[in-house]
């Protein structure tokens, strides 16, 4: 095996370049134009998106980004770059970053690796649970960006890692660390990003993966169904999404006697707007208003050592041995 010829591309969803309405509008436009995300008829969706949704949502979302923006960049970008650096040190291989939407583009990341002499590229979408809305969208971007290229790079793409032992171990250790530092709550709620129920009805395996991740995490922590559960957050639009919804679940827990809650989002590999603002702040308010007394938000795995170890193990298993 010639490690010098192998390179790694970490892929995440993307982020606005700045916490401004203009930057958020540009990012959301690209994201919500993807048929993997919204498959509504284009003649209906595009006028609705540009005439109603973006003008209203962009300024509101920009204010939310301002509340979590870090000194150097957005949280998603900062933590993603830390992952790149840590994984590169761990593997002693070139590692680059690509975003499905926005910059740096997936193609830019691949070209950067090729410039470093990589002729075998392992693409690791940082979505533990597969979905057409995330992992499949990465496939689409690669196909679109290399549509007119005569000779394609040698790609190997990771499909999912929802049940990888090191992933489950890393999640469990992050929860145990929270218990050690902040005390153990009555219940652990695993809040996953939601997708339309219709996508699952049409064959998306995302929900199956989320359920399995939760089951394995419960086993690792030694928790029963009265001590751990799952829900889905970030619903968009009026269509039915995967249930139970996190917002509704939070309203029900305290009246059932669960007065202290630990909440984690296993589907996110790095902290971002959906975890730092929605899960940490909005959801806390819902739970406390419903009668909760203690709400502990557990951060994403980010560049945690066990998380990087997991990535390294996955990549190493994909590199050619010939």
UniProtKB/Swiss-Prot annotation:
The protein's predominant localisation is cytoplasm
Q: Which Pfam families does the protein's record reference?
A: Ferrochelatase
Q: What is the lineage of its organism?
A: Bacteria, Pseudomonadati, Pseudomonadota, Gammaproteobacteria, Vibrionales
Listed NCBIfam families:
hemH (TIGR00109)
GO aspect biological process, one term: heme biosynthetic process
Q: By its UniProt entry, which HAMAP family does this protein fall under? A: Ferrochelatase
In short, the EC number is 4.98.1.1
Query: What PANTHER family would the database entry show?
Result: FERROCHELATASE, FERROCHELATASE, MITOCHONDRIAL
Q: What is this protein called?
A: Ferrochelatase
Q: Which organism is it from?
A: Aliivibrio salmonicida (strain LFI1238)
Q: Where in the cell is it found?
A: Cytoplasm
Per the record, its GO cellular-component terms are: cytoplasm
GO molecular function terms listed in the Swiss-Prot or TrEMBL record = ferrochelatase activity; metal ion binding
Reactions catalysed, as given in the entry: heme b + 2 H(+) = protoporphyrin IX + Fe(2+)
Q: Which family does it belong to?
A: Belongs to the ferrochelatase family.
Per the record, the pathway is: Porphyrin-containing compound metabolism; protoheme biosynthesis; protoheme from protoporphyrin-IX: step 1/1
Q: Give residues annotated as binding Fe cation.
A: 193, 274
KW Mitochondrion (keyword) present: no
Q: What does this protein do?
A: Catalyzes the ferrous insertion into protoporphyrin IX.
